[in-house]
């Protein structure tokens, strides 16, 4: 995805054997093609509401990032939240993914006025750690690309998306880019690299 620049040359043959050339540079925007499995999984072809999959181990978790020690484990090997193991206020967020065009998806996050910010990432959001008033209103147009991680198709869809600004999915983990590890019609598992290089994992389910 991105822009590509091309030079187009038109040659005109005139009377008497005269030839004239005209060249012009044009810029073409190439959009990333969102795979149908991702589009359908996130939006159902129209719109879907997602919530934290709080009954599943590791619905919030952390492990080593790509530049740490022995490398990534690609699962929350350092910490994984147990079923309903976080505070109740962390489980009331609703994420609405909507198909806004043949190749575009938007996100609206209703955090009920508060978001849990991981303490190490307070500077990223300009807020202290723990529960904070955080404005997530507005519709965010998501930008999809191929994943930049070293994951394989065995453990990831190899697709990631970015939420504009300091956008997030429920917990504030110091990143606005999320790799979709797994998606079904009812479950979603994502991974992101926090501001300090840790790999964070989150799991959601359809409401």
Where are these regions (language model features)?
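Short, solvent-exposed loop/turn segments at the edges of extracellular beta-sandwich modules
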Residues: 13-18
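Contiguous, well-ordered beta-strand patches that form the walls/edges
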Residues: 80-183
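Short, exposed beta-strand-loop hairpins at the edges of beta-sheets
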Residues: 187-197
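Hydrophobic/tyrosine-rich beta-strand signature of extracellular beta-sandwich/beta-rich modules
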Residues: 8-10
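Edge beta-strands of extracellular beta-sandwich domains
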Residues: 19-28, 201-204
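N-terminal helix-cap/turn-to-beta initiation motif at the start of protein domains
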Residues: 30-51
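Short, solvent-exposed loop/hinge segments that bridge or flank secondary-structure elements
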Residues: 52-102
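Surface-exposed, short loops/turns at beta-strand junctions within beta-sandwich domains
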Residues: 1-5
